[in-house]
Amino acid sequence: MPLISLVGSQRPDSFNASAVTLIERALKSLGAASERAEWANLALPLYSQVIELEQGLPKAAGDLRSRIKAADGLIIGCPEYNGFMPPLLLNALTWATRNPRGHPDLSPLDSSPALFARAVLVA
């Protein structure tokens, strides 16, 4: 299974998306395949135990969870917003680490190597 990449920004000219693209190209030159998890295709609700208890794990969350679990690794482009991880990325990782029974389950991240990248602008 190819590597899965996530970028914590939806901005079209995101520096972090550019950084992840460079990483993906470098890995491709070494023979590693990767695929980007696009936010437009995820459609995840804001994490809530109320939603989880009443409606179960959203299909998009289960799909992301399965993709991460099956992947050979994870590439995360993580911008910093006011010193924190972006809510979009945190929400996706929160849903991806919940099991169908509504419990925390970090197993999708257990056996996969992960690379965290961040673009930093120095003024």
Predicted region positions:
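N-terminal glycine-rich anion-binding loops that anchor highly charged ligand groups
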Residues: A33-E38
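N-terminal beta-loop-helix "entrance" segment that forms/cooperates
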Residues: W39-L57
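N-terminal beta1-alpha1 ligand-phosphate binding loop
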Residues: M1-A32
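Cofactor-binding loop segments of dinucleotide-utilizing enzymes, especially the Rossmann-like FAD-
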Residues: G8-S9, W39, A123
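Helix-loop-strand module that forms the ligand-binding subsite of alpha/beta enzymes
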Residues: G56-A123
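Short, glycine/charged-enriched secondary-structure capping and boundary segments
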Residues: S18-T21, Q49-E52, L89-L93
